[in-house]
Amino acid sequence: MENIIKIKNIKLGESAPKICVPVIEKTEKEIIKYIKYINKLPIDIIEWRADFYLEDIIYNEESEINIIEISKSIKKITNKPIIFTMRSYKEGGKLKSDFYNNIIDIYKTVIKNKCFDLIDLEILTLKERDIKNLIKLAKENNIKTIISNHDFNKTPSKKHIVYIINKMIKLKCDIPKVAYMPKNKKD
């Protein structure tokens, strides 16, 4: 892992924290409209939470083609770095666990088509071999990787957090990310 990650004109790990705005709209029209709006704001990064878009869609090859087309539309609007995220239900997102194989296929399609600048992979949702394969594919296509873990019900023990972050680093992601819900001052 490097200390400074350069994505387009943004350097993560250098100077001031960066502002990232999520896009949680459900239709292509709403997604494009919102990105046009936030692109005018003083933000650094856009995160497309595709789990909101995919929540009510029956997955098929057309879904992948739509994601590619949406990414092309987004790139016409903004030059800001874009994170592609499909957050699982258990980590605060909209995707159910029965969508697993589709998640892997969509990530592969997004990576091979160089649709986005970064992808966010959940360490406790995806199988380790799938994470390794996706990271390898992402590196081959010059796409940065975030490995994340979220728990919005509690903060795990310090030992568990250190274990998770070390595992993320061992998997050779570009950016390890954890987000937990503090319940008391100790957290």
State what each model feature region is.
Residues 1-33:
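N-terminal amphipathic alpha-helix/helix-capping segment at the start of soluble metabolic enzymes
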Residues 33-53, 116:
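Catalytic domains of carbohydrate-active enzymes, especially glycoside hydrolases
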Residues 60-90, 113, 135-146:
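Alpha-helix-loop-beta-strand connector modules within alpha/beta enzyme cores
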Residues 26-40, 98-110, 157-167:
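Short, acidic/polar
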Residues 123-187:
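Catalytic alpha/beta core domains of metabolic enzymes, predominantly
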Residues 45-74, 121, 128:
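Glycine-rich, proline-tolerant flexible connector loops at the mouths of alpha/beta enzymes
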